[in-house]
């Protein structure tokens, strides 16, 4: 995900990003966030609820943003930092899977899925 570019922003009852890397290690990653999360831009943090479409308008500017790093923490948090200083932070939800990250890694197309579990924790498939 690091060094990748956001090629798609998806808005429905959740918020999604598709991130592509174009170097020799070409990879594709999709993030889907289903619960409230923090969006930081210009030093200001906003809590966004994907169930309220009007709150997601500022996220459209993430299209073509460069990703500095993205990682999941064992306690169920997901963090994505962008090169321009923006960030997305997702905390675990007590009742629902708060986020899912899926993708493919080279050199052999190897698919994976990470899921932020209800309560705390992360599940890895693949």
Locations of regions flagged by a protein language model:
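Surface-exposed, interaction-prone regions used to assemble/regulate multi-protein complexes
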Residues: 1-126
């Amino acid at each position: 995900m690091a060094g990748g570019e956001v090629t798609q922003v998806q808005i429905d009852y959740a918020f999604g990003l598709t991130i592509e890397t174009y170097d020799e290690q070409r990879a594709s990653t999709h993030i889907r966030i289903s619960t409230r999360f923090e969006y930081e831009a210009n030093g200001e943090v906003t809590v966004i609820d994907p169930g309220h479409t009007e709150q997601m308008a500022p996220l459209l500017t993430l299209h073509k943003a460069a990703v500095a790093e993205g990682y999941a923490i064992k306690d169920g948090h997901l963090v994505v930092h962008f090169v321009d200083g923006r960030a997305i932070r997702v905390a675990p939800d007590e009742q629902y899977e708060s986020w899912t990250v899926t993708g493919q890694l080279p050199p052999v197309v190897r698919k994976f899925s990470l899921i932020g579990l209800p309560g705390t924790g992360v599940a890895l498939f693949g």
